[in-house]
Every structure is written in structure tokens, then in C-alpha cells.
């Protein structure tokens, strides 16, 4: 093989390596409004993690053991979920595969949304809504009790750039990224998308229950 051919093969090999996904890129999530996270989750709780360990969780198709991280938690309040308290939370062992890291020791409280596994267990990923409790606004905390649930039939559409539009009356346009370059902006912190009596949806601000006039069509 000539030098030119060897150089070409080397260049092609390097190009292939450069285009392969890196482990850190393996977990990719689309931003969601807190209300969407609430509505999409099976379980939403306020809790502390008290201990952690790695456990086997069955085998893959090749017979190799599947490892997961198990957090033993102390549930403080359940906003959505089964009648039984959640005792254990499971997640993947690495952030590269969307695993979540929680502080243990029982001091830091979290709002945790995820998928139910039954028997007091749930599973979480980096794509779920998991944030320290003390970072939530007072409106977000109060909306967990009832407000977000009122809008689960509505659709929140994120606007990544101007122009953007809604395609149906049951949508609310989420503008935080355009107006504040953040997914944790004003609409995320202080607004919920609520269905009105005619089936349309609109942003509602505040911690107080929506007025009947708002539900019966009133500009927010």
C-alpha cells in the first residue's frame, strides 16, 4: 500500500472517530415547563435521600447484570402518585445514560418527578423534573397542589426563536427562552397553563385559585 493510500485511510479513521457520539452526549433531553413535567410524571414528591447503593436489576439480552443506583428516601409529601409512600428511587449509574445524582444524608430536600415502579419504588432520569425544593418559587410550590393538574389537558409549546405560533386553542406558548434565554424564566416560575370553560387554554399567573371569570373567558 502506498503512502498516499495509508494517509487517506488514517484521515478517514480520524474523521470517523470525530463523528462518534461521546458518552457525555448520550443523554439528551428536551426542555419542559414545570407543569408539563408534573403532568407527564406518574409520581411527584417532595423528599430527602438518606442513603445510596448500587444494586443489580436483572440482566440484559446478553446475560450481563444491569446495574442501577438505589436511593433510600424519606418522603415528605406526595403531590401525585400511588397511595403507598415512595421508599426507594432508582436511576442509571452514570449521567451519560441519564442517571441522577442526589445528595444523601437527609439534609437536602428535592422536588422529584418520575415513573412509578410499584411497591413503593420509582425510577428517575436526568430528563425528569428534579430540583432542590428551596429553588422553587412560592407559586410553583403552591401550583403542585392543584394548579398544574388543572392544565394537564392543555399543551405547552416552547418557542425557541421568533416567530412562533400556537396551532390550536388548547396551547399556551412558552416564551422564556426567547425573552430571558432561560428555561427557568418568568413563565416557568409564576405561570400555569389552565383550561377554560370553552376548551381553550391560557396562561394564569399567581398562587390564588383562578377566578370563575377567568375560567369563563377573561384575558389573563
Swiss-Prot record:
A single Gene Ontology CC annotation of this entry is: extracellular space
Which cysteines form disulfides?
27-98, 29-127, 39-152, 154-201, 159-164, 172-193
Site (Involved in metalloproteinase-binding): give the residues. Answer: 40, 61, 67
Q: Which CDD domains match?
A: NTR_TIMP
Q: What Pfam families does the record point to? A: TIMP (PF00965)
Keywords on this record? Disulfide bond, Metal-binding, Metalloenzyme inhibitor, Metalloprotease inhibitor, Protease inhibitor, Secreted, Signal, Zinc
Q: Span of the secretion signal?
A: 1-26
Which function does this protein serve?
Complexes with metalloproteinases (such as collagenases) and irreversibly inactivates them by binding to their catalytic zinc cofactor.
Q: What is this protein's record name?
A: Metalloproteinase inhibitor 2
Q: Which gene encodes it?
A: TIMP2
Amino acid at each position: 500500500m502506498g503512502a498516499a493510500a495509508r494517509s487517506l485511510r488514517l484521515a478517514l479513521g480520524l474523521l470517523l472517530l470525530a463523528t462518534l457520539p461521546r458518552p457525555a452526549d448520550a443523554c439528551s433531553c428536551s426542555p419542559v415547563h414545570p407543569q408539563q413535567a408534573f403532568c407527564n410524571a406518574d409520581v411527584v414528591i417532595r423528599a430527602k435521600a438518606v442513603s445510596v447503593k448500587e444494586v443489580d436489576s436483572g440482566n440484559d439480552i446478553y446475560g450481563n447484570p444491569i446495574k442501577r443506583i438505589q436511593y433510600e428516601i424519606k418522603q415528605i409529601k406526595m403531590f401525585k402518585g400511588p397511595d403507598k409512600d415512595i421508599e426507594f428511587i432508582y436511576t442509571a449509574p452514570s449521567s451519560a445514560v441519564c442517571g441522577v445524582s442526589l445528595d444523601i444524608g437527609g439534609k437536602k430536600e428535592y422536588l422529584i418527578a418520575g415513573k412509578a415502579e410499584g411497591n413503593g419504588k420509582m425510577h428517575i432520569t436526568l430528563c425528569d423534573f428534579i430540583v432542590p425544593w428551596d429553588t422553587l418559587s412560592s407559586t410553583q410550590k403552591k401550583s403542585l397542589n392543584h394548579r398544574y393538574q388543572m392544565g394537564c389537558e392543555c399543551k405547552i409549546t416552547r418557542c425557541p426563536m421568533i416567530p412562533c405560533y400556537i396551532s390550536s386553542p388548547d396551547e399556551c406558548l412558552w416564551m422564556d427562552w426567547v425573552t430571558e434565554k432561560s428555561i427557568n424564566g418568568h413563565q416557568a416560575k409564576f405561570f400555569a397553563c389552565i383550561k377554560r370553560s370553552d376548551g381553550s387554554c391560557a396562561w394564569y399567573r399567581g398562587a390564588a385559585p383562578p377566578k370563575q371569570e377567568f375560567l369563563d373567558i377573561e384575558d389573563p
